[in-house]
Amino acid sequence: MRLGRIAHPEGICFAIIDGPKDAPMQELVAKEIAGTPFTPPEPTGREWKLNEVRLLAPTLPTKVVALGRNYADHVAEVFKKSADSLPPTIFIKPSTAVIGPDAAIKIPDYATNVEFEGELAVVISKPSKNIKAENWQDHVLGYTICNDVSSRDLQFKDGQWARAKGIDTFCPLGPWIETDLDSLNLDDQKINAYLTHEGSREQKQDSNTDQMIVKMGG
């Protein structure tokens, strides 16, 4: 199931994004659900074509907990070191960084070297703490896409990552949450990013979750 959050002509709601997996966006339908995706979804009967609404961030996290330096190829590209010599590190993006998939990223004047990072994002289904590795999927609602926007100049200048990665709008999420946990091989998912402008489309990132140092559930 695909669960999203939309702005429609009468307000904002969560919705089931319905349609074939390979259908173009304009053929998908957003079916409003009562409440939030964190309870069994109950359709209200209202629906809109997806091109009649605006996709928002599919969830409203209190914070985004991230694992940096977790892709071997990315560590080599950005930090010029091997994954063995530079272990992963945890950092947090604030809720104010979260925006929808089509919202504008606003770069402040003091950030002069801003880069994208396409990421696999895990949406936690309930308050959780001290989870055993073998039970991790019991706490997952689904997966979405994150653009971990980063100001490299601030990141290396500050020595810590809060400012460089936590600027307002520096965490686009979406377009929706995919809840079909069994159909995804999380150890072999392509992570691609494209830059589009006036009809042109240029691939800017070509990675895969098989480059993860700490695997899902690890």
Task: Specify the residue positions occupied by each region the protein language model found.
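Catalytic-pocket segment enriched in acidic/His residues
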Residues: 10, 32, 45-46, 74, ...
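Structural signature of FAD isoalloxazine-binding scaffolds in flavoprotein oxidoreductases
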Residues: 83-101, 116
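Short hydrophobic-aromatic micro-motifs
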Residues: 5, 64-67, 120-124, 142-145, ...
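A generic local secondary-structure boundary/capping motif
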Residues: 4, 54-56, 78-81, 105-114, ...
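Short loop segments at secondary-structure junctions
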Residues: 20, 96, 125-129, 149-150, ...
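Non-heme Fe(II) oxygenase catalytic core, chiefly the N-lobe of the double-stranded beta-helix
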Residues: 102-136, 141, 145-154
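N-terminal non-catalytic cap/leader segment that marks the start of a structured domain
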Residues: 1-89, 184, 192
